[in-house]
Amino acid sequence: MTALNTPEAKAQSRARQFDRLTDESGKYAVSPLPFTYDALEPVIDEKTVDLHYNFHHKAYAAAANRAEEGLAKARDTNDFALVKFYEKELAFQLSGHILHTIYWSNLAGKGAEPQGDLAKSINADFGSYQKLKGQLVAATTAVEASGWGVLGYHPTLRKLMVLQIENHQKLTAWGIVPLLVLDVWEHAYYLKYQNRRPEYVGNLFKIINWNGVAERLDAARA
């Protein structure tokens, strides 16, 4: 078996494909959606997907580029008066870009329960899929203000974990690899659900792409 055909190489290749964050020049850029704007109906309406992708996600990538440019200028001029601002901007905007990239790949599934090694890992770490779902729904719904619910894998601990993220970058745990992210910023659901966040979060499980989540777990373990 050649190095390019090992399970590890294949997992890393998959990770690169569904997590492309930059264009050929190295600038942060948004990849094309893996589905049409109406593909998530009736769970998420076409207008929300359009606005979310074209105006919110793309704005995070553009702002991350501006933050990088600001830091580069600071280094070139040895003027770090605005370093705190640009570091905070980069953490927020780049995290938003990364999480949205994962979010789109997590959707457009059939909503069936996880299978195979992913299901075994869920059972080992949470007791059952239903217990994981209960915790993830509750944690995501309870995020204070804007943020995310995350199912992640910690390679050092070798376990799955559920986390809340406020904004895009707060309350995470170092080393966690996001596998499934649920967006509860209001722009993700307000046109259709208004203040009914619990309904939106529950409905997301009808369209989760668990095969993609399983691929992410394979890549994280490689």
Where are these regions (language model features)?
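Acidic, low-complexity proline/glycine-rich segments
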Residues: 15-37
